[in-house]
Amino acid sequence: MMTKPNQRGGRQKSDTQNNLVLNCKMKMYDDAGSDSDDGFDLRQEIARSAFADMCHDWERNQKYDQALQLTIGRLHAAGREAHVLDIGTGSGLLSMMAVRAGADSVVACEAFRPMADCAERVMAANGFGADRIRLIKKRSTEVRVGPGLDMERKANVLVTELFDTELIGEGAIATYRHALEHLLEPGCLTIPHSATVYAQLVECPLAVSWQVPKILGNADGDVLLRTPEDVVDCRGSSAVFDVQLSQLPETSFNALSEPVSVFGFEWSNREELEVKRHSKKPVEIIRGGIPQAVFMWWDLKMDLEGSVLLSCAPFWAHPDFSSLKESNKNPTIPEQNLIPWRDHWMQAIYFLPYTKNTLIPGQRVNLDSFHDEFSLWFGLESPNLPPTHCSCGFHIAYSRSRIGQLNDGLRNKRSLNYLEQILDKSSTVLVIGDGSLLGVAIGALGVSHVYLLEPGQLSRTCMESYIRFNGLKNVSILSDLAELDASQRAAISHVYGEPYFGSAILPWENAIQFGALVKQIRPVLPPKVTFIPHSFSVHAVPVEFLDLHKINAPLGTCEGFDLSAMDRMIEEHSNETDSPVEAQPLWEYPSFALGTPSKLLSLPLSQDLPETQLWQGEFQLTQNPEKCNGIAVWADWHMDGSGSPKTTISTGPLESTADGEQPIRWNANWRQGVHLVKKAPRDGVVKWSVKFNGQLRACYFQFE
């Protein structure tokens, strides 16, 4: 079945992640069966809940299981019963583990009704009826304790997974504080027992390129655009910047310090679970550089003694990395992928207040760390630093990946070189798209005039700031093309788009939207207008993902429990809502090419897009077809009709994928399209078809 590409956007990596996972505290929906848009969103969220990798995280599952056995065994050895409460049970996995470990009673609560109903089916399928696990379909804060109520008695063991990349972003502090006061006995044991947050001071120009727009210049070194000071000084978005730090090129950052622990959370101690804290840690500088950011991660001590440790550290700081490297028998796996993989808990980047000061080896500085109920932030020698928020508007208008695109040196070089060749002082340029700094920079090339078509207020305000700061008198901003009179429209010689639109999710959607707008405005423009880009194409390559495919893999059995009921629920809702091509930042997910890239389609942008068109073909898997678990898809825009690489902007691989021996190097400023293959092709052939619908402005993909 062909379905429309996903319009939800998924996890934006450079912005925020909102995956629903199997054992988290989920949003309550009042109308699970609605056919409205909210009903569609609900079905999609159910579908995505198992597409997170939670139950495929074997280390996480095994260490929760070990901690339950140790904790329950500890109580029994002391002659005490073990009464377990599982908050946010999700699939019911942790509750079933608790029963298997010998718990005397288990109460599970789950507020998300469709998931709670599914957990009930999972428990029954594994032989755990209401006499073994009492399932309460409520939020933990609504649970009542007492004879004849939700819980007959308070629990003395709490097992839960309330964490996200930022540790406390899902409300762990408030949930634990409530449970400790109302649902748990004094002196109770919690699984996990405690958490530690770590920070590492770094200089990382790559990360900064996702935070601050650089000065824009041409090949001759002429400065075309400078960045307004309020944008440079702004601390940026308050949204967590969750990243697979292990996939950062080692040459892309300079570790100025060793990792240091900055916060500890003892989950069984209500008094120590403060909503707001500040810590000051002296840090010794081990390498010189400018302090630009902090890399953050955390670990969990799963049991009271701390004998079971679950770490979310990147590979260079992971406690098991050395032993895993020594025991590795597969030389094709990059060493940064030897540590256990997970996508539900990653690491995060926090930007420090802007400075040009360089730290030197041996210097000691104070790292200030802060947290409130939901978030973290960091500073240097800044004991009164307020929480991060955008004060300039730029980081609200544009995502981090968009800022990365604006700073893409190769993209800017090719675009400006071409624009300088075809434009002159008589040119009048209409720029279509959101937040095009290249469009603003055209004004500095000496053209007659530039009109920026910016319907969105936020983006329009940001572009106005750039125009004022750079003193560009020949650049005007329009909210609607109707603001131009007939003589002004008649003077337009070129229409330019990067193309970029904030509403686009998959790369080619930018080009399609540009083409659709061109079709609308063409009748009011001079007949000999030049349109840039000239055309766009979509390409794909069959790949082997090392890990990404796990987000779409069926659960089957997990730690000896049958979770097929979960699989059936997920599949049912996925068939209704999910697209065969989803957006993912593939630089974070290593993949190997298993064949030669194919061009799936090509469409003109200098002419009207067709009403409909169909393309068909097949991939020949030249290497290890049995390993094929995905198709990676990307778009290229072509500024002219020459087909030259020098006039092509690509959102895909940075170099040839021909050898297949090394992971593909992806453009880190774009999310590419991904189709996850459920079953590897036996004959080494994957058939594909793409249908373009001009009226709906969409491409429909099918892979067989």
Swiss-Prot record:
The family annotation for this protein states: Belongs to the class I-like SAM-binding methyltransferase superfamily. Protein arginine N-methyltransferase family. PRMT7 subfamily.
Which parts of this chain are annotated as the region Disordered? 642-661
Q: Which residues form the SAM-dependent MTase PRMT-type domain?
A: 30-377, 380-704
Highest taxon of source: Eukaryota
Look up and give the organism this protein is from: Culex quinquefasciatus
- E.C. no: 2.1.1.-
* Keywords associated with the record: Methyltransferase, Repeat, S-adenosyl-L-methionine, Transferase
What protein is this chain from?
Answer: Protein arginine N-methyltransferase 7
